[in-house]
Amino acid sequence: MPTIQQLIRTERSRLKAKTKSPALKSCPERRGVCTRVYTSTPKKPNSALRKVARVRLTSGFEVTAYIGGVGHNLQEHSVVLIRGGRVKDLPGVRYHIIRGTLDTAGVKDRRQSRSKYGAKTPKE
């Protein structure tokens, strides 16, 4: 424990908050190119085949990103936009691919939460 004199001499250093999405480099989104599109299995209590893609970003990072929604049109060399946000049951997946932008199509026949999946207003 420091003395008051030691604290006067040198102030306590603040702890720097570590970012949860370092590959974005303080940007809201980043563009990248898919290098591999595949499925992955989640952690213990859950069971599924989650769609993920390995993406090389313009910031120089290569990250694993989750493809949300039902069905997708992504393949190798597709250009995608990535946002932060992890997938709790997939270790190492800290990013999401934004649907409805660049080469990523929106989800078909989506009626609720359309803005999250890049779906246009359905025709009546």
Curated annotation (Swiss-Prot):
SUPFAM superfamilies: Nucleic acid-binding proteins
PROSITE patterns: RIBOSOMAL_S12 (PS00055)
Source superkingdom: Bacteria
Keywords, sorted A to Z: Methylation, Ribonucleoprotein, Ribosomal protein, RNA-binding, rRNA-binding, tRNA-binding
Gene Ontology CC terms: small ribosomal subunit
3-methylthioaspartic acid modified-residue sites: 89
GO BP field: translation
Single annotated GO MF: structural constituent of ribosome
Ranges for region Disordered: 104-124
Complexes and interactors: Part of the 30S ribosomal subunit. Contacts proteins S8 and S17. May interact with IF1 in the 30S initiation complex.
Family matches, as HAMAP family: Ribosomal_uS12_B
Protein family: Belongs to the universal ribosomal protein uS12 family.
Described purpose of this protein according to its UniProt entry: With S4 and S5 plays an important role in translational accuracy.
Protein name per UniProt: Small ribosomal subunit protein uS12
Species whose genome carries this gene: Parasynechococcus marenigrum (strain WH8102)
Lineage: Bacteria, Bacillati, Cyanobacteriota, Cyanophyceae, Synechococcales
